Amino acid sequence: MANEDNEHSVQHIGNTILVVMMEVEPEGEEAFERWYNDEHLPERLEIPGYVSARRFKLEEGEGVLKYLCIWELEDASPLEIDMYKAQRARPSEIRDRANQYITQRARGLYKQIYPLTGAYEDHSGYYPEKERV
């Protein structure tokens, strides 16, 4: 969707992110990927207030966990509703299998502090088709 003031697309964004980092034993990565991509992501994104999710795998670095997921939320409320609690309590063979290989996990809930809403964007050189001012 284009914004009237410029030609850049506008995407709904929440003001809270849930950051989840995990370390997984190499022999369990296939089971972990299957669980996260095929079950965990779709289930969580059904919960009202979850906006989006992006997953990353460490390319280089030390002292950090290999897998990262950034969940974008409207606010912290989705983590407190019954649907979220029911998903966490529901048995899942694929999740149980994947969890056997998770050796470390860290999680943090972050609230946006700047700008207060929306996103700060630098368009000065990111869009090469536009003339630079």
Q: Which residues make up each language-model segment?
A:
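Macromolecular interaction modules
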Residues: A2-V133
